Amino acid sequence: MGSSPLDRERRCLVFGDESVSLTPLEYGVLTRLVDAEGSVVTRDELLADVWGQPFGGSNKVDVLMRSLRRKLGPCAGSVETVTGHGYRFSGWPQSK
């Protein structure tokens, strides 16, 4: 696995000299996925764990994932959509 751009102390992403801020929800979703260590996290689990809402039926997760992937830039592929199930963090890309 590659080096993590996630700075947990500052709650941001760091790419070289550039720092990319994360909203509290983006940070919550990303750390939930990273901490799941490759396991699938369902939309309902994200809603319950990050938003504190125990039910689905919302596009909140989809909207946030689009924003988070934009901010992840070259690491966007690290967050995989598992169709019909949820999302999985596949690891940070290897540095070249």
Regions found by a protein language model. Name each.
Residues 1-27, 88-96:
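A structural micro-motif at secondary-structure boundaries
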Residues 79-90:
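Minor-groove-contacting beta-hairpin "wing" of winged helix-turn-helix DNA-binding domains
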Residues 12, 17-24, 28-64, 70-76, ...:
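Positively charged, aromatic-enriched patches within helix-turn-helix-type DNA-binding elements
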